[in-house]
Curated annotation (Swiss-Prot):
GTP 2 binds at residues 182-189, 229-233, 294-297. The keyword GTP-binding applies. This is GTPase Der. Residues 352-436 form the KH-like domain. The lineage of its organism: Bacteria, Bacillati, Bacillota, Bacilli, Bacillales. Signal peptide: none annotated. Associates with the 50S ribosomal subunit. Residues 4-167, 176-351 form the EngA-type G domain. Belongs to the TRAFAC class TrmE-Era-EngA-EngB-Septin-like GTPase superfamily. EngA (Der) GTPase family. It holds the Pfam family KH_dom-like. GTP 1 binds at residues 10-17, 57-61, 119-122.
Length: 437
């Protein structure tokens, strides 16, 4: 199930970014220790009343015919289209402006739930400033202060009331859900069409749980698959595709509903920062991952080209060192026959369980090979380890002091797990917990 999406809209300089930062709080900070994982700070996650959601800051909506204003407005409309709930921010000190009225008309036409936040109400004496905003026809204005963090609980309470019901995908648990993600023009839709055409399979289009998403179900060699949000890959227009944060928004919804993510790169153009950002979202979500280099037929090659590109991927995607790499061409069907077998394999690895006794024997051998670290004379002691989850495989190490589990030693333990078991294509989570917890 994809998380609900809140879009924050309003004219420029009403405090949208401040509200955004208040809602997401420290979640904007990067918590991944490995190099290369970056996050677009215009887009982040939040949680309120035990409901997780995604939130996006749209930038200011201005009325005018200048090309930049037209593009900004179009981008905001796209965010509104993707949102489940809209927070409309206005400036309580300036009152209702003509621009506010135009934004209100835009929101009214969208027929989406709208929560009206009147910002910069920094003192109880300013409550009377609210009444004017009833004229926008949006509903009850909620007084807030982004600067002081006032009223945000009421704002989020109202948003949660409009969240859609938490419904899961109605697919059999043995069905492998696949999403293709990547920046514009890497050939995602061409890959989808080539994969479906190549396999000569029975194909059916199924409405996804995300609004206007269409999933494509098919089977191959007695394995059921679903390609998530194929409509999203095919329908985007130029404005949508040229705006990183909105294509990322759609990709994140697809990632959340997937078991396996194909990170698609353009072999002709090489690797850019946006590729790393998009791949980072799949890694952070804990999905099984395959890196697919498309358009390989168009690359001029010598006998070292493949090796150089592989090394470039390993250098740029150090946080995806577990992901297999496939070089394919949607146009010529080159190596496409390897994609689905790789998907099936990494899905199996993503759900692999290791018996507890085997796990503990491995850890004892690892500690004998490389003793646990010490800090100020105190040594980390691993009492025992158990696997608590799959998808991704998650291991809890019960220790004397979790603070002593340095990142480098956790990495060593992960590498020992990978050397021993089939974990290609899947991230691994290692959690240190005090023995008595």
């Amino acid at each position: 199930m994809s998380k609900p999406v809140i879009a924050i809209v309003g004219r420029p300089n009403v405090g949208k970014s401040t509200i955004f930062n208040r809602i997401v709080g420290e979640r904007v900070a990067i918590v991944e220790d490995r190099p290369g994982v970056t996050r677009d700070r215009i887009y982040s996650h939040g949680e309120w009343l035990n409901r997780e959601f995604n939130v996006i800051d749209t930038g200011g909506i201005e009325i005018g015919d200048e090309p930049l204003l037209v593009q900004m407005r179009a981008q905001a409309e796209l965010a509104i289209k993707e949102a489940d709930v809209i927070i409309f921010i206005v400036n309580g000190r300036e009152g209702v402006t003509a621009a506010d009225q135009e934004v209100a008309k835009l929101l009214f036409r969208s027929k989406k739930p709208v929560v009206l936040g009147v910002n910069k109400i920094d003192h109880p004496d300013m409550q009377e400033e609210l009444y004017e905003f009833y004229s926008l026809g949006i509903g009850d204005p909620i007084p807030i202060s982004g600067a002081h963090g006032l009223g945000l609980g009421d704002l989020l309470d109202a948003c949660v009331e409009h969240f859609p019901e938490d419904e899961g995908d109605d697919y059999d648990e043995d069905t492998i859900r696949i999403s293709l993600i990547g920046r514009p023009n890497v050939g995602k839709s061409s890959l989808v069409n080539a994969m479906l055409g190549e396999e000569r399979v029975i194909v059916s289009n199924i409405p996804g749980t995300t609004r206007d998403a269409i999933d494509t179900a098919f089977s191959r060699d007695d394995q059921e698959y679903v390609l998530i949000d194929t409509a999203g890959m095919r329908k985007r227009g130029k404005v949508y595709e040229s705006t990183e944060k909105y294509s990322v928004l759609r990709s994140l919804k697809a990632i959340e509903r997937s078991d396996v993510v194909l990170v698609v790169l353009n072999g002709e153009e090489g690797i850019i920062e946006q590729d790393k950002k998009i791949a980072g979202y799949a890694h952070e979500a804990g999905r099984a991952i395959i890196i697919v280099v498309n358009k390989w037929d168009a690359v001029e090659k010598d006998d070292k080209t493949l090796h150089r590109f592989q090394q470039k991927i390993r250098d740029e995607f150090q946080f995806l060192d577990y992901a297999p790499v496939l070089f394919v061409s949607a146009k010529t069907k080159q190596r496409l026959q390897h994609v689905l077998p790789a998907v099936k394999k990494v899905s199996e690895n993503h759900n692999l369980r290791v018996p507890t006794h085997v796990l503990n024997d491995l850890v004892m051998d690892a500690v004998a090979m490389n003793p646990t670290p010490t800090d100020h004379g105190k040594r980390l002691k691993i009492n025992y380890v158990t696997q608590v989850a799959v998808g991704p495989p998650t291991f809890v190490f019960f220790v004397n002091d979790p603070e002593l589990m340095h990142f480098s030693y956790a990495r060593f333990l992960e590498n020992r797990l990978r050397d021993t078991f089939e974990f290609e294509g899947t991230p691994i989570k290692i959690i240190a917990r005090k023995k008595n917890d």
